[in-house]
Amino acid sequence: MSSYFVNSLFSKYKTGESLRPNYYDCGFAQDLGGRPTVVYGPSSGGSFQHPSQIQEFYHGPSSLSTAPYQQNPCAVACHGDPGNFYGYDPLQRQSLFGAQDPDLVQYADCKLAAASGLGEEAEGSEQSPSPTQLFPWMRPQAAAGRRRGRQTYSRYQTLELEKEFLFNPYLTRKRRIEVSHALGLTERQVKIWFQNRRMKWKKENNKDKFPSSKCEQEELEKEKLERAPETAEQGDAQKGDKK
């Protein structure tokens, strides 16, 4: 390859000095190869380093001069005003709680306050328990082996039940409900009263079976009335014999 062709090719590109990375686009930064590397950070002052060697892209290694450091005016301008670092105006930053309600900012630790409030309520409930309302179905039921008290009927209830018994000793389910509602009793109480009344009638009449119909009951009453004079005569005869 001829030198003429190489020279014509490289004449279109920049030299090695201009190919060095330029970190900050400043008009005052020129010939950075002869200056120490400047590192910018969050601190106010710029720190710099003196590397022993910098590998050149095209001209090989070259030693740096140890001349006293002079701060670049571009570095002062760039570091002094971080807002204009890239040529833009600084952004107006707002506080995290600036747009919120001031009351919320005042009580930032809401979770701890809520937890403490719940703890106080739990302690208060343990110290002063509120009385609970007891319903009849919530009370303990009577034991299986425990005997219930004897049911007492008023004179009015007994009279009405006797009338119903004379009219019909056996009640249907519908009539039993009507009688229980009229007398203020339960169906079970009415049923038990009629069972006891039929057993009492059997003992009084010396019958093993209660009459199932009203006609049979009337016949039994007639027989009882016919036997009454005979029993009276027998009683008078016994009294005469004793005299």
Swiss-Prot record:
It is found in: Nucleus. Residues 203-243 are annotated as: Disordered. A motif (Antp-type hexapeptide) lies at residues 134-139. Forms a DNA-binding heterodimer with transcription factor PBX1. It comes from the Eukaryota. Residues 146-205 bind DNA. The keyword Membrane does not apply. SUPFAM superfamilies: Homeodomain-like (SSF46689). Belongs to the Antp homeobox family. Keywords: Developmental protein, DNA-binding, Homeobox, Nucleus, Transcription, Transcription regulation. GO terms for biological process: adult locomotory behavior; anterior/posterior pattern specification; dorsal spinal cord development; embryonic skeletal system morphogenesis; grooming behavior; negative regulation of myeloid cell differentiation; negative regulation of transcription by RNA polymerase II; sensory perception of pain. PANTHER family: HOMEOBOX DOMAIN-CONTAINING PROTEIN (PTHR46166), HOMEOBOX PROTEIN HOX-B8 (PTHR46166:SF2). This is Homeobox protein Hox-B8. The keyword Nucleotide-binding does not apply. Gene3D superfamilies: Homeodomain-like. Pfam families: Homeodomain. GO terms for cellular component: nucleoplasm. Sequence-specific transcription factor which is part of a developmental regulatory system that provides cells with specific positional identities on the anterior-posterior axis. One of its GO terms (molecular function) is sequence-specific DNA binding.
